């Protein structure tokens, strides 16, 4: 989800993802027509636990 994405970006780049990625590509805002399909995907995603020990995502092991 978006919060997990932001956390991953913060860990890897030391930057907050939202100011950098909300204007990335063709983003017309939450609920905008061009992003309707993309926004709907977030309701269908699975949330799971992960860690970044040794910079290896534990879910990839």
UniProtKB/Swiss-Prot annotation:
It comes from the Eukaryota. Binds 1 Ca(2+) ion per subunit. GO terms for cellular component: extracellular region. Keywords: Calcium, Disulfide bond, Hydrolase, Lipid degradation, Lipid metabolism, Metal-binding, Secreted, Toxin. Its EC number is 3.1.1.4. Expressed by the venom gland. One of its GO terms (biological process) is arachidonate secretion. Ca(2+) binds at residues 27, 29, 31, 39. Its main location: secreted. Its cofactor is Ca(2+). It is found in: Secreted. It catalyses: a 1,2-diacyl-sn-glycero-3-phosphocholine + H2O = a 1-acyl-sn-glycero-3-phosphocholine + a fatty acid + H(+). InterPro entries: PLipase_A2, PLipase_A2_dom, PLipase_A2_dom_sf, PLipase_A2_His_AS. The active site is at 38, 60. One of its GO terms (molecular function) is calcium-dependent phospholipase A2 activity. The keyword Disulfide bond applies. It holds the Pfam family Phospholip_A2_1. It is an enzyme of class 3 (hydrolase). Snake venom phospholipase A2 (PLA2) that displays edema-inducing activities. PLA2 catalyzes the calcium-dependent hydrolysis of the 2-acyl groups in 3-sn-phosphoglycerides. Homodimer. Belongs to the phospholipase A2 family. Group II subfamily. D49 sub-subfamily. This is Phospholipase A2.
